[in-house]
Amino acid sequence: MIGGDATVYTSRPSLGATMKSAEISGTNQLSAKLSKKVSTDDLKGKVTVTDADGKAVDVKSLKADGTKVIITADKDLDVRGKYTVEIKGFGSQNAIAGSVVRTDAFDRKYAYSGEDLGATFTKKQTGFKVWAPTAAKVELITYKSVDPNAEIDQTIDMTSESK
């Protein structure tokens, strides 16, 4: 067994260095956790970041702190996006929104102060509103009855609007 690895091996795995995880940790930062300590100098020329379309993301700076690597991008990252972080000798991991959602910058940009989230009912219609700034897709599912085993009636793709 390898810590953090759910794979069931049928032969002895290589216990080389690996990247355990990656996340969007700031508006223009990604963080990666490695299986062994590195220095910032060890990383020079070894880190690449690509977006969901495979396009390279320009890296402004790197900082290593033990087994944690902080990658600062040249521009803000899309919190709904998926990025791939690759570090030569450690492999790659997909990074999605992580600790970025607990930052002041995230709150300033995405906080919602309205009081109309959830279902808003009138005699003519029921409207549904959710706050999901990191979601790439949100679906509303309605059922044919209130029975817990009821069949799905409709699946409706919700649209993204400004706050």
Model-derived regions, located:
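Aromatic sugar-binding surface patches on proteins
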Residues: 63-73, 161-163
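Surface-exposed, short loops/turns at beta-strand junctions within beta-sandwich domains
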Residues: 73-82
